[in-house]
């Protein structure tokens, strides 16, 4: 059981550690001026949006931008803290912040995936997932950002490794 718990902690560590450059170099391109990024990163984003038909990153609507602002303001500062906690392992103090984080992220990614699967996209949009295959391919890009937070939430809620033991007062 301890090996399984430690494996999960390593998964969470790599998730949070890798999320720092992904957020800074990729995700924030949706809200920051292009002048802040080198041309190679702008070209990479253009290739990605065309190849995977990600209209949310190509032409982000206001609701999606609000999610990216939350990622920048609320989540990004949490990434190194969480990476440290899971690298170290067994840090009970990460439980409540991880529950808040995972519930928040799962909620936003469910909205994104729902939009991708069920949204109506005008045929005039050059970049949009118009076929079922396009939609499922794009969902597969976003899915890990739902699955790992849900796994984190379940771990924090049900793993005895992270439960705080209550101190009872003697009478």
UniProtKB/Swiss-Prot annotation:
<dbReference type="GO" id="GO:0005886">
    <property type="term" value="C:plasma membrane"/>
</dbReference>
<dbReference type="GO" id="GO:0008142">
    <property type="term" value="F:oxysterol binding"/>
</dbReference>
<dbReference type="GO" id="GO:0031965">
    <property type="term" value="C:nuclear membrane"/>
</dbReference>
<feature type="site" description="Important for 20(S)-OHC binding and stereoselectivity">
    <location>
        <position position="145"/>
    </location>
</feature>
<feature type="topological domain" description="Lumenal">
    <location>
        <begin position="119"/>
        <end position="137"/>
    </location>
</feature>
<dbReference type="GO" id="GO:0032377">
    <property type="term" value="P:regulation of intracellular lipid transport"/>
</dbReference>
<feature type="domain" description="EXPERA">
    <location>
        <begin position="8"/>
        <end position="153"/>
    </location>
</feature>
<feature type="binding site">
    <location>
        <position position="75"/>
    </location>
    <ligand>
        <name>cholesterol</name>
    </ligand>
</feature>
<feature type="topological domain" description="Cytoplasmic">
    <location>
        <begin position="88"/>
        <end position="97"/>
    </location>
</feature>
<dbReference type="InterPro" id="IPR051987">
    <property type="entry name" value="Sigma-2_receptor-like"/>
</dbReference>
<dbReference type="GO" id="GO:0005791">
    <property type="term" value="C:rough endoplasmic reticulum"/>
</dbReference>
<dbReference type="GO" id="GO:0032383">
    <property type="term" value="P:regulation of intracellular cholesterol transport"/>
</dbReference>
<keyword id="KW-0256">Endoplasmic reticulum</keyword>
<comment type="subunit">
    <text>Homodimer.</text>
</comment>
<protein>
    <recommendedName>
        <fullName>Sigma intracellular receptor 2</fullName>
    </recommendedName>
</protein>
<feature type="transmembrane region" description="Helical; Name=4">
    <location>
        <begin position="138"/>
        <end position="158"/>
    </location>
</feature>
<dbReference type="InterPro" id="IPR033118">
    <property type="entry name" value="EXPERA"/>
</dbReference>
<keyword id="KW-0472">Membrane</keyword>
<feature type="transmembrane region" description="Helical; Name=2">
    <location>
        <begin position="67"/>
        <end position="87"/>
    </location>
</feature>
<feature type="transmembrane region" description="Helical; Name=3">
    <location>
        <begin position="98"/>
        <end position="118"/>
    </location>
</feature>
<comment type="function">
    <text>Sigma-2 receptor which contributes to ameliorate dysfunctional cellular processes and slow degenerative progression by regulating cell functions including cholesterol biosynthesis/trafficking, membrane trafficking, autophagy, lipid membrane-bound protein trafficking, and receptor stabilization at the cell surface. Forms a ternary complex with PGRMC1 receptor and low density lipoprotein receptor/LDLR at the plasma membrane, which increases LDLR-mediated LDL cholesterol internalization.</text>
</comment>
<dbReference type="GO" id="GO:0015485">
    <property type="term" value="F:cholesterol binding"/>
</dbReference>
<keyword id="KW-0539">Nucleus</keyword>
<comment type="similarity">
    <text>Belongs to the TMEM97/sigma-2 receptor family.</text>
</comment>
<feature type="topological domain" description="Lumenal">
    <location>
        <begin position="28"/>
        <end position="66"/>
    </location>
</feature>
<dbReference type="GO" id="GO:0030867">
    <property type="term" value="C:rough endoplasmic reticulum membrane"/>
</dbReference>
<dbReference type="GO" id="GO:0140077">
    <property type="term" value="P:positive regulation of lipoprotein transport"/>
</dbReference>
<keyword id="KW-0812">Transmembrane</keyword>
<feature type="topological domain" description="Cytoplasmic">
    <location>
        <begin position="159"/>
        <end position="171"/>
    </location>
</feature>
<feature type="binding site">
    <location>
        <position position="73"/>
    </location>
    <ligand>
        <name>cholesterol</name>
    </ligand>
</feature>
<feature type="site" description="Likely important for receptor folding">
    <location>
        <position position="54"/>
    </location>
</feature>
<keyword id="KW-1133">Transmembrane helix</keyword>
<feature type="short sequence motif" description="ER retention motif">
    <location>
        <begin position="167"/>
        <end position="171"/>
    </location>
</feature>
<dbReference type="GO" id="GO:0005764">
    <property type="term" value="C:lysosome"/>
</dbReference>
<feature type="topological domain" description="Cytoplasmic">
    <location>
        <begin position="1"/>
        <end position="6"/>
    </location>
</feature>
<dbReference type="Pfam" id="PF05241">
    <property type="entry name" value="EBP"/>
</dbReference>
<dbReference type="InterPro" id="IPR016964">
    <property type="entry name" value="Sigma2_recept"/>
</dbReference>
<feature type="transmembrane region" description="Helical; Name=1">
    <location>
        <begin position="7"/>
        <end position="27"/>
    </location>
</feature>
<dbReference type="GO" id="GO:0042632">
    <property type="term" value="P:cholesterol homeostasis"/>
</dbReference>
């Amino acid at each position: 059981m301890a090996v399984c718990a430690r494996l999960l902690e390593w998964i969470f560590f790599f998730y949070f550690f890798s999320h720092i450059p992904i957020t800074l170099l990729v995700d924030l391109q949706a809200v920051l001026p292009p002048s802040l990024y080198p041309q190679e990163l702008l070209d990479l984003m253009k290739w990605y949006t065309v190849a995977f038909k990600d209209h949310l990153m190509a032409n982000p609507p206001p609701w999606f931008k609000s999610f990216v602002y939350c990622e920048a303001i609320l989540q990004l500062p949490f990434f190194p803290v969480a990476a440290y906690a899971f690298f170290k392992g067994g840090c009970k103090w990460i439980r409540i912040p991880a529950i808040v984080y995972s519930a928040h992220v799962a909620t936003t990614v469910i909205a994104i995936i729902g939009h991708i699967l069920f949204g109506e996209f005008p045929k005039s949009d050059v970049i949009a997932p118009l076929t079922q295959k396009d939609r499922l391919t794009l969902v597969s890009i976003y899915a890990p950002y739902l699955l790992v937070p849900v796994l984190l939430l379940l771990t924090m809620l049900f793993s005895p490794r992270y439960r705080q033991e209550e101190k009872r007062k003697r009478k």
